[in-house]
């Protein structure tokens, strides 16, 4: 899982750099640019620190996928709405799927989707300029999360079946080797 953590950190770094550059290009060097970029960079620092802490892989994975997602919502709120920023959450959903663990997807998608619904009532611009657009984005995110969860669940089941079949083959190989050894001794 360590390799997935590191790969996801690189994705976060690339996203922070990209969003910082596009923020400066969009808003110039203003107060909201500094605040927005500050949230992004603070999130990167938090995620990097957690990577080196002695905590479970599950906790690391949750911090790696949830912190950037919440940071994007905060960022969007600080720059007074950014309809493109929400799309970055599809990247964090993909990062959650890379762990190939339905538990991580579930514990990521449910609270984040609920937070997005709350954002609709705080400031719809955090998600999208229009209420209908925000609803659409949240529904698409939730549907994607459900489909990816179900796909991962199916994949986990097939992996367990393949492992069981491999174990059976290894047992059969051991029996065949013992029989061959005994026949050769006679």
Where are these regions (language model features)?
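Short, Lys/Arg-rich, polar N-terminal cytosolic tail immediately upstream
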Residues: 1-2
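Hydrophobic transmembrane alpha-helices and their membrane-interface boundaries in multi-pass
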Residues: 5-81, 88-94, 112-116
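Membrane-water interface at transmembrane helix exits
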Residues: 51, 76, 123, 152-156, ...
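A helix-boundary/kink motif common to multi-pass secondary transporters
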Residues: 56, 100-101
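Alpha-helical transmembrane segments and their helix-entry boundary regions
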Residues: 61, 97, 104-106
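Interfacial aromatic-anchored transmembrane helix boundaries in multi-pass membrane proteins
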Residues: 74-81, 116-138
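HAMP domain helices
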Residues: 131-186
């Amino acid at each position: 899982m360590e390799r997935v953590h590191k790969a996801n950190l690189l994705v976060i770094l690339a996203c922070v750099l990209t969003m910082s550059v596009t923020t400066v290009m969009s808003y110039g060097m203003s107060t909201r640019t500094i605040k927005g970029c500050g949230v992004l960079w603070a999130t990167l620092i938090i995620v990097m620190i957690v990577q080196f802490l002695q905590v479970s892989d599950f906790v690391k994975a949750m911090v790696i996928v949830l912190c950037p997602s919440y940071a994007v919502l905060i960022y969007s709120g600080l720059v007074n709405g950014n309809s493109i920023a929400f799309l970055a959450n599809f990247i964090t959903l993909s990062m959650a799927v890379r762990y190939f663990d339905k538990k991580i997807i579930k514990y990521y998608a449910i609270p984040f989707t609920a937070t997005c619904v709350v954002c609709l009532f705080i400031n719809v611009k955090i998600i999208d300029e229009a209420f209908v657009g925000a609803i659409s984005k949240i529904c698409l995110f939730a549907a994607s999360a459900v489909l990816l969860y179900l796909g991962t669940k199916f994949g986990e089941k097939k992996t367990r079946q393949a492992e069981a079949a491999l174990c059976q083959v290894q047992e059969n190989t051991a029996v065949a080797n013992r029989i061959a050894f005994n026949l050769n001794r006679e």
